[in-house]
Structures are given as structure tokens and as C-alpha cells.
């Protein structure tokens, strides 16, 4: 009788978790299912995979199998386990063989741990303005239903009315327990995960909890200072442009950024100096007067300097 290497059959490692093993089982069950596979040994491989899954999916059976595998070269194990008849060990022999080798006291009453269905992820687009308050959203998705061989039998359309909390961030995951796929063996449903995607905004860029907005100003507003109206997520504010402001300068508006449970970010106004269109004769004369008055000013004097 031969003790099979169930981990090798499943293509996994002994250290892999149940989720990884279950994924491997589903993949192999689909690959070798006799109704699907064209390979000549598909039926035998399918039974072998099912046998491996029967043991490795049960927490206690897996622990007992690991113990048997660890002792497979021990003399006591060989005397009890190998009969020289060339037969292969299978999952049906498991209980009797384990008890004969390690004794009944080594076994404990066990129940197969409840498996659970697959989780589902759905990306949900949220506008920046919607992050300020809790709001309701209708979510529609297809719920896959798997058979015992890990293949999708059907997809059921499903619609939920969910609450999106205030202060959600890009990439945040919201769990809806039990709204995933049902387990094919009668275990609990998986979960539905809503993955938040903050939609691009035409005015604001997100930098952590802060927001940035480009504010166009005229050359004279930058030079002389001004007060300009700037939008925020909630309302418009009057922003003070200091005299002598430079292009690219960032002006902080405290508390006007993104809101979360932990903190409120700031809004940064990034100044962009916008030149007027091609000047007429009178405007050109005024620019010339300014150039003459500032003849000693060289905007490129610091080029190449650290």
C-alpha cells in the first residue's frame, strides 16, 4: 500500500493555507472533470484530486495525514502500513490506518470545518463631493453559483441598496458579510467587498488627505496681490493672493481637504500666472514701461545654481 503525496497531487506546498488548496482543487477539478477533459487519464486524475481534497480540506485529517507523512519512513509505520500487495492508500482507509498506527487516543472527535463560498469584489466609483457625507447607492452584480466540482453552473443577477460611509478613501474596501457566492457544500456564503474608486475630478487632485487646485491669476494679481474666488468641495471661498506671488506657489487653506474619521485634510491652491492675449498698441506700451522700470531684473540669473 502506497501513501500518496496529496500536496504534490494538488500542486501545493504543505505550508499553504486552505484557501490556496481550495483554489488548486477547483482548478484541477475543472481540468480533469470527465465531462470536460479530453485527456485519457482524466477520470483517474479527477478521482485522485478529489481524494486529496477530501483529506486536505479537513483540518484534523490534514494534521493526521501530515503526521503519517512525517513518519512514513519509520519502521513501525512500515510494518503497519505496507502490506506488500501493491495497493494504494486512499481516503476511505484513512481512519482505520491512522488508528492502527498511532492508537485511538491520538484521534479526537472531529467535525469537518464549515467551508464558505467565494468572496466577490466590485469596484464602486464615488465622486469627491460624495465623500463628505454618508450616502446610499444601488449596487447590481452577478452572483456565480458553483457546483461540487468548482464549476460555475449559473449566474444570478442581484441588486443591493448599500450605504457608503462618509470619509471613504481611494482603494478602501467595505465588507458586506454573506453577500458573496453560496458554498457548494452548504457552508456559509462568501462576502461581497466594495472597493472604492474615487472618480477623477475636473478641478481637484488628491494628495493623501489633501486636495490641490490650480488657480489661474493675472500677472498684476500676482504682482500687486488680490482676492479671488476659489471653489472647494462644499462652497466657494475668497482666497487672498499675497503681493509678489510666484507661479507654482502653493497657498494653504486649512480644513478644506478630504474628511475622514481620523483627520481633515487641507486645500492647496497652486498659482498659475496666465498672460493676457497678444497686446494691442496701448497695452504693449504699458508693458514696455514696466520693462524699463524693471530693467535690472533678470529672471534667469539663478539658472544652473544650486
UniProtKB/Swiss-Prot annotation:
InterPro entries xrefs: DNA-bd_curved-DNA, DnaJ_C, DnaJ_domain, DnaJ_domain_CS, HSP40/DnaJ_pept-bd, J_dom_sf
GO cellular component: cytoplasm; nucleoid
Gene name of the record: cbpA
UniProt protein name: Curved DNA-binding protein
GO molecular function: bent DNA binding; unfolded protein binding
Role of this protein: DNA-binding protein that preferentially recognizes a curved DNA sequence. It is probably a functional analog of DnaJ; displays overlapping activities with DnaJ, but functions under different conditions, probably acting as a molecular chaperone in an adaptive response to environmental stresses other than heat shock. Lacks autonomous chaperone activity; binds native substrates and targets them for recognition by DnaK. Its activity is inhibited by the binding of CbpM.
Species whose genome carries this gene: Shigella boydii serotype 18 (strain CDC 3083-94 / BS512)
GO biological process terms on file: chaperone cofactor-dependent protein refolding; protein refolding
Subcellular location: Cytoplasm, Nucleoid
Record domain J: where: 5-69
Taxonomic superkingdom: Bacteria
HAMAP family assigned: CbpA
Predominant localisation class: cytoplasm
This protein's UniProt keywords: Chaperone, Cytoplasm, DNA-binding
Amino acid at each position: 500500500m502506497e501513501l500518496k503525496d496529496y500536496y504534490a497531487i494538488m500542486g501545493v506546498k504543505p505550508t499553504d493555507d486552505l484557501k490556496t488548496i481550495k483554489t488548486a482543487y477547483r482548478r484541477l477539478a475543472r481540468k480533469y472533470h470527465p465531462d470536460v477533459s479530453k485527456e485519457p487519464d482524466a477520470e483517474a486524475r479527477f478521482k485522485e484530486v478529489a481524494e486529496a481534497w477530501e483529506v486536505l480540506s479537513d483540518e484534523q485529517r490534514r494534521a493526521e495525514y501530515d503526521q503519517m507523512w512525517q513518519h512514513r519512513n519509520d519502521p513501525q509505520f512500515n510494518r503497519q502500513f505496507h502490506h506488500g500487495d501493491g495497493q494504494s492508500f486512499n481516503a476511505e482507509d484513512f481512519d482505520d490506518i491512522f488508528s492502527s498506527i498511532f492508537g485511538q487516543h491520538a484521534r479526537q472527535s472531529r467535525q469537518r470545518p464549515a467551508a464558505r463560498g467565494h468572496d466577490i469584489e466590485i469596484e464602486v466609483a464615488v465622486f469627491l463631493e460624495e465623500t463628505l457625507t454618508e450616502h446610499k447607492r444601488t449596487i447590481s452584480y452577478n452572483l456565480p453559483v458553483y457546483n461540487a466540482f468548482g464549476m460555475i453552473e449559473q449566474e444570478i443577477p442581484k441588486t443591493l441598496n448599500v450605504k457608503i460611509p462618509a470619509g471613504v478613501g481611494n482603494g478602501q474596501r467595505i465588507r458586506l458579510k454573506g453577500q458573496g457566492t453560496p458554498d457548494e457544500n452548504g457552508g456559509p456564503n462568501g462576502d461581497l467587498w466594495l472597493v472604492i474608486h474615487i472618480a477623477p475630478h475636473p478641478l481637484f487632485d488628491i494628495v493623501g488627505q489633501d486636495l490641490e487646485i490650480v488657480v489661474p491669476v493675472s500677472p498684476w494679481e500676482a504682482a500687486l496681490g488680490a482676492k479671488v474666488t476659489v471653489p472647494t468641495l462644499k462652497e466657494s471661498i475668497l482666497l487672498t493672493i499675497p503681493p509678489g506671488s510666484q507661479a507654482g506657489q502653493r497657498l494653504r487653506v486649512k480644513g478644506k481637504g478630504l474628511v475622514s474619521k481620523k483627520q481633515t485634510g487641507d486645500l492647496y491652491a497652486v498659482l498659475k500666472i496666465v498672460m493676457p492675449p497678444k497686446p494691442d498698441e496701448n497695452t504693449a506700451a504699458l508693458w514696455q514701461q514696466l520693462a524699463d522700470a524693471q530693467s535690472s531684473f533678470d529672471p534667469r540669473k539663478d539658472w544652473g545654481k544650486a
